[in-house]
Regions:
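Loop/helix patches that line or flank the sugar-binding groove of alpha-linked glycan CAZymes
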Residues: 1-97
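A residue-level signal for conserved active-site and pocket-lining positions in enzyme catalytic cores
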Residues: 40, 100, 129
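Short, flexible beta-strand-to-coil junctions
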Residues: 70-72, 107, 137-138
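Conserved active-site loop/cleft motifs that coordinate metal ions or position small ligands
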Residues: 77-80, 102, 135
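C-terminal beta-strand-rich structural cap/linker in extracellular carbohydrate-active enzymes
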Residues: 115-138
Length: 138
């Protein structure tokens, strides 16, 4: 649930507080951590390429990273910006596509990203310290 904890001498109980689940009934709609975990769980069930797809590295720099999981002509691309400033990425598509769908766009705290598919390449603009999953479509 994104609860901060503090390790104390002789005990780690503060790291694992007792929770009343009734206090978190709307956490998926209000808590960014719970929202993303719930979405990732759903996507693992809905997108077999995430579990069974071949791993393909698409780009790697000191600040950004993109890789795909590809299965039966379908692909999901994970894009990461570990830097403190926005980043533009461009890389070859692992499968033919005419567009992308941001699979985490509905999560609490998600930010808009710009994407463009052109000439077999994907261009992505990511905010600082941000990541998402993109399904290639078309």
């Amino acid at each position: 649930f994104g609860i901060e904890g503090k390790k104390e001498w002789g005990s780690d109980w503060p790291l694992r507080p007792c929770l009343e689940l009734a206090d978190y009934t709307d956490a998926e709609k209000t808590n960014p951590v719970t929202s993303i975990y719930a979405a990732l769980g759903r996507l693992k069930a809905e997108c077999p390429e995430l579990s069974w797809g071949e791993f393909k590295e698409l780009t790697l720099t000191t600040q950004s990273y993109a890789y795909a999981r590809v299965l039966d002509g379908k692909a999901v691309v994970a894009v990461y910006n570990n830097g403190d400033s926005p980043v533009s990425m461009e890389f070859q598509l692992p499968v033919e596509a005419s567009g992308v769908e941001d699979l985490l766009a509905d999560c609490v705290g998600s930010q808009p990203i710009l994407t463009q598919v052109e000439w077999g390449k994907l261009k992505v603009q990511l905010p600082s310290n941000y990541a998402t999953l993109l399904r290639l479509v078309g």
